[in-house]
């Protein structure tokens, strides 16, 4: 092989290698080989919300990596986060809600369940029963932070009143040792505009659901 032919062959080889062997045309630039580039997370936008039945002090809350206890109803949340905010008496979860400036017991729901009137009233009954303050606001004692267990709030008034954990919490931490009735709880929240708005919204959803139900009579049953 002459020197000229050798140089030409070597030059051709180098060109082919630099082009990826002549096949596939720069394989690393194909879409299937590009690294995923997810959108960067939005910066944290801390806001202050209010949990109100009356404003409650001493509720534990969790919102993503943000945790703490409410102070006169106030809690912190990230307005850029899609995580729900959940509220607890100790380790007893009352429910969770989409974050917002105002949250009431009637905005809370159990996982996989919508917010409801019955659960809202039962949460209100329990919170007001455990109130140790002599002011219009609600204050939970530090002892309630030791509470553990699970309560189902979406049950009838009577069933809720006989729930073992509810009875235990009332016996341990309620100043009067008595669970308030639904009527008593309703009177306490009657003048809270935020709570009444939440109740009105739930009633509207309920009415719309009922109006959409079609009843068909079966003539064979008459």
Predicted regions and their residues:
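C-terminal motif of bacterial Sec signal peptides marking the signal peptidase cleavage site
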Residues: 15-18
